[in-house]
């Protein structure tokens, strides 16, 4: 499953057929049905090219995408969230995070062994305890279209924006974060247990926020940009 996750991170347009061919080329004997089952379990689907870790909830309200053509020019203008699969030596977890688009600052993150919406609500509450963005962007997954989630945002006076179906570029900053976290930490460390993963990410995200210079930020850190933006706002 780790190989599938790593290849999908590089090639999110891979479906089960291409993934099976690639695994075979790497010397792994596996049939396509098994690859299909594993990709479904991991929430991965080659749909231009969005990983399908969540699906729209029946009867849930889907909000329009508010950010097409919008220039992101300040801290707190847009926050967004997403969920990704995290492989362990034995098993896996799901990771969700909230990121500020302008600064790339990770405001909050949380792990879960299921895709139950409660851990997304807990993540949202943790993020909102630190501030209120103007717009909060998500995909159309059941966790994020649930009335409990969107209601929290509306009650806080935050506009809700949702990606167009299958459009990963609508939430590109979180997608880039996942690639960075996986290649700089998760794949390198090869975490065996949930406590190890939790401790490891507990070290990595402060490093990402406060020590790792970001090319798109003129080699400043997300934390420096985020705090500077908050200071200007006040």
Positions of PLM-derived features:
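Charged DNA-binding/catalytic regions of mobile-element recombinases
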Residues: 1-234
């Amino acid at each position: 499953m780790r190989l599938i996750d790593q290849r999908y991170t590089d090639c999110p347009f891979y479906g089960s057929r291409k993934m099976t061919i690639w695994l075979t080329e790497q010397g792994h004997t596996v049939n396509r049905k098994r690859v299909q089952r594993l990709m479904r379990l991991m929430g991965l689907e080659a749909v231009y090219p969005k990983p399908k870790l969540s699906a729209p909830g029946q009867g849930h309200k889907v909000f329009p995408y508010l950010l097409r053509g919008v220039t992101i020019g300040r801290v707190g203008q847009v926050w967004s969230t997403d969920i990704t699969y995290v492989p362990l030596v034995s098993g896996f977890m799901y990771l969700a995070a909230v990121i500020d688009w302008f600064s790339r600052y990770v405001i909050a993150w949380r792990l879960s062994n299921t895709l139950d919406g409660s851990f997304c609500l807990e993540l949202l509450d943790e993020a909102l305890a630190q501030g209120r963005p103007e717009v909060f962007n998500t995909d159309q997954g059941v966790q994020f279209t649930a009335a409990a989630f969107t209601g929290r945002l509306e009650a806080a006076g935050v506009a809700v924006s949702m990606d167009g179906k299958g459009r990963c570029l609508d939430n590109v900053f979180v997608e880039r974060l996942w690639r960075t976290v996986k290649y700089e930490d998760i794949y390198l460390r090869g975490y065996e247990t949930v406590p190890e993963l939790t401790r490891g990410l507990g070290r990595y995200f402060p490093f990402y926020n406060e020590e790792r210079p970001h090319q798109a930020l003129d080699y400043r850190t997300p934390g420096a940009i985020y705090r500077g933006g908050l200071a200007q706002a006040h």
